[in-house]
UniProtKB/Swiss-Prot annotation:
Pathway: Cofactor biosynthesis; coenzyme A biosynthesis; CoA from (R)-pantothenate: step 4/5. Reversibly transfers an adenylyl group from ATP to 4'-phosphopantetheine, yielding dephospho-CoA (dPCoA) and pyrophosphate. InterPro entries: Cyt_trans-like, PPAT, Rossmann-like_a/b/a_fold. Homohexamer. Its EC number is 2.7.7.3. GO terms for cellular component: cytoplasm. This is Phosphopantetheine adenylyltransferase. Its cofactor is Mg(2+). Belongs to the bacterial CoaD family. The record marks H17 as: Transition state stabilizer. It comes from Lachnoclostridium phytofermentans (strain ATCC 700394 / DSM 18823 / ISDg) (Clostridium phytofermentans). Substrate binds at S9, K41, T73, R87. It is found in: Cytoplasm. Keywords: ATP-binding, Coenzyme A biosynthesis, Cytoplasm, Magnesium, Nucleotide-binding, Nucleotidyltransferase, Transferase.
């Protein structure tokens, strides 16, 4: 059975992430979206919120599940019996960084291989950081995130403003 892990912070999940999820789910028997709990970034959403948002947007993909984790991705993969790590590449700068990580992960566990997906052209510029920047000013994020989570993102910023 081919089990893949797509790790990330997904803060928030974007249409670019969803594109990689849908495409990678086609080549894996099971795809686990690993939501990083101890990211070095300060998240907008808690890990629990990010898991719920992802579950909402992938509910129509039967072989995908969402799990929070912390620690090394290779240890998480080993625990789940996964042999493949999924990564999306937007630009050559992504490739340089992701290649280093992929080679390091392979050194840590030689049974782990990284599968790279180049981002579809319409999402090649997109990042969660861009979405957060636009949303923080009340801009239109409907072209960047799944419709089902747009209001949740705006609500998060409205709540931050009223605190």
């Amino acid at each position: 059975m081919k089990i893949g892990i797509y790790p990330g912070s997904f803060d928030p999940v974007t249409l670019g992430h969803l594109d990689v999820i849908r495409r990678s789910a086609k080549i894996m028997d099971e795809l686990v979206i690993g939501v990083l709990a101890n990211s070095s970034k300060t998240p907008l959403f808690t890990v629990e919120e990010r898991v719920k948002l992802l579950e909402c947007v992938v509910k129509d993909i039967p072989n995908v599940k969402v799990v929070a984790f912390d620690g090394l991705t290779v240890d998480f993969a080993k625990k789940l019996g996964a042999k493949f790590l999924i990564r999306g590449l937007r630009a050559i700068t992504d490739f340089e960084y992701e290649l280093q990580i992929a080679q390091t992960n392979h050194k840590l566990d030689e049974e782990i291989d990284t599968v790279f997906f180049t981002t579809s052209v319409e999402y090649s510029y997109l990042s969660s950081s861009i979405v957060k920047e636009i949303a923080s000013y009340g801009g239109d994020i409907s072209k960047f995130v799944p419709n089902s989570i747009i209001q949740v993102i705006y609500d998060k910023y409205n709540g931050k403003r009223s605190e």
